[in-house]
Amino acid sequence: MRKQKRHVYGRSLYFLLVCILIFTIAPISAWAASADQSSALKNKASKNKTTVTKTVTIETAGQIIKKKVKCGSTVILPTEINRNGYTFLGWSTVRGQTCDPMYQAYEKLHVTKNIHLYPVKYKWSQEPDIYVGGLADSVDKYDKIIFVGDSRTAMLRSTLQRQCGSDILKKMSFVCQTGQGLDWMKKWGEKQLFDEISKTDDNEKKTAVIFNLGVNDLIHKNGKGVSYDSVASDYASYMNGLSRKLTTRNCELFYMSVNPCNTAMKPTRKESEIRGFNNRLRQRLNGNFKWINSYSYLMRHGYTTRCEFRGYTDDGVHYSMRTFKRIYSYAIKQIR
């Protein structure tokens, strides 16, 4: 009997010890598992926090600039001054490219991989000297072609007079004023334009009017920037109203984009703002206008900013006579 009691007591004690071990070890195992899981999550988070960087390499002005940036971020591409003999157009991944850049100055580049950029330089010596005499006469559907603009338009007129003689102006008129923009157009330019149109009122053929204003209203004054969006809105509002008057006078209307400049040569104009102005204005002009995208044409094929009318200097804004003739030729072909 005593033996039996001892046996029962021993079994009970054994069972109790097993239970104690189970309840002691289980929480430790659970904590260990939890700790392992937490550690794994921390390691994963640590890996996720590791910033992946890419290198943007730019060769400019005889030096190589390397910039490390976060993958997926954006960088604003710089501009470069025009050296003697060429116009800087933008950037490309191809060395030695002379026109049609992949990227333009002040363009936002989305970086997802390492990239090496080279300047795209248009050599002035490669610009063709085209003949444009008689080009306007080939556009038979218009009785007259009127260009409206600023100093660039005035220099276009001077180029045609020098290169082709006064006869080329028989079918063309120019309403322009150096250094002016929308305010001048409202106060003086509109009246001058209608005076020119009045000379053709008796003709059955239409008059083509090509506007090329805007670059002077994008000037940074006193170090202050400019809102190209609001400037474009002001232009669109006025031009759309003017178009309704002009279409009743048998006119067909065109707006030629503000053409490129080089901010490094002319800090008061910014290339990205010219592009922004062109895009906004094109969207907001009404159906009475047809858009002439000479900006893209010049970027694709190149242009020269060594201007004969400025003492053969390069101010980054005004063009050579060869470029002006090419702009004129492009515009005439677009209105045919």
Tell me the role of every PLM-derived stretch.
Residues 1-9:
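N-terminal secretory signal peptides that target proteins for export/translocation
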Residues 37, 44-126:
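Secondary-structure capping and domain/repeat boundary segments
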Residues 16-26:
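Bacterial N-terminal signal peptides
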Residues 11-14, 30-35, 123-148, 153, ...:
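N-terminal secretory targeting modules
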